[in-house]
């Protein structure tokens, strides 16, 4: 199931919708290029050195997930733009939604795991559990990635079952839009089943992300206060350096939470494909996802070096 499911009879396309569609495609293309660059840069390093840090393994996995997601989004939205009144559970959209559900859940889980990794590796907490995790965490990355794939697969399968039930019911009714039983089943699944699955499966990693990011920020603020008092002569230089270091982290938090909220609101709205609101939600969601790869490109040391070499 995607964010818009109601079919209307109108075949006309509003100019505003066309504009939003073009903006959406351009945003997705920028995200594809940004994530593709991350994949190539880190992938080349992995091939040349035969090794990659745990942090960069998470980054390349997140970039790959986002790269594929943006490609699916482009394909799906081109299809629904050209076929705005098609049945939203037909086999083509079912396949696109299956990939969208999997990749969206995978992206959320990978962001959550990246936040957990940042907290454990960067936080200055001295609790024995954190000290123990610092040494154990790099070896857990493959299992973390596998768990993200598993949870994402579960989400997509559960949503696909609901999509398939609606399509089968629609096919049995002879594709009649006024079939009361079919419409009742569809509205019930859209209102309760799909939304509940996505809220649960998206909220769990978001809560994990929020907890560990809060711990990290508290730890960093405490550390900054102590250092600020100790280095009275270099306060301006020190403050500027720490602000630059904190900016990517803060942007990651803001963009992740913004993307989560827009996904939830978009799923709750159940807007028809050809309506202005559907395309507006799509633009807002993917505006959040296009900014973070750019932040990563200019904040990650490995990627920054590649960019500088490319510009020279």
UniProtKB/Swiss-Prot annotation:
Q: Which Pfam families match?
A: TAS2R
Positions of transmembrane segments: 20-40, 67-87, 98-118, 141-161, 199-219, 245-265, 278-298
InterPro entries given in the database record: TAS2R
* Topology, Extracellular side: 1-19, 88-97, 162-198, 266-277
Question: Where does it primarily localize?
Answer: membrane
Q: Does the keyword Endoplasmic reticulum apply?
A: no
Going by the entry's taxonomy, the superkingdom of the source organism is recorded as Eukaryota
CDD domains from the xrefs? Answer: 7tm_TAS2R41-like
Q: Where in the cell is it found?
A: Membrane
Which GO terms of the molecular function aspect are on file? bitter taste receptor activity; G protein-coupled receptor activity; taste receptor activity
Family annotation (SUPFAM superfamilies): Family A G protein-coupled receptor-like (SSF81321)
Look up the record and give one Gene Ontology term from the biological process aspect: detection of chemical stimulus involved in sensory perception of bitter taste
One GO CC annotation: membrane
- Membrane topology according to the record: Multi-pass membrane protein
| Positions annotated as glycosylated | 179
Q: Which UniProt keywords apply?
A: G-protein coupled receptor, Glycoprotein, Membrane, Receptor, Sensory transduction, Taste, Transducer, Transmembrane, Transmembrane helix
Q: Which residues lie on this side of the membrane: Cytoplasmic?
A: 41-66, 119-140, 220-244, 299-312
User: Which function does this protein serve?
Assistant: Putative taste receptor which may play a role in the perception of bitterness.
List, alphabetically, the PANTHER family matched. TASTE RECEPTOR TYPE 2, TASTE RECEPTOR TYPE 2 MEMBER 60
What other facts are recorded? Several bitter taste receptors are expressed in a single taste receptor cell.
- Family designation: Belongs to the G-protein coupled receptor T2R family.
Q: What is this protein called?
A: Taste receptor type 2 member 135
Per the UniProt entry, what species is this protein from, by scientific name? Mus musculus (Mouse)
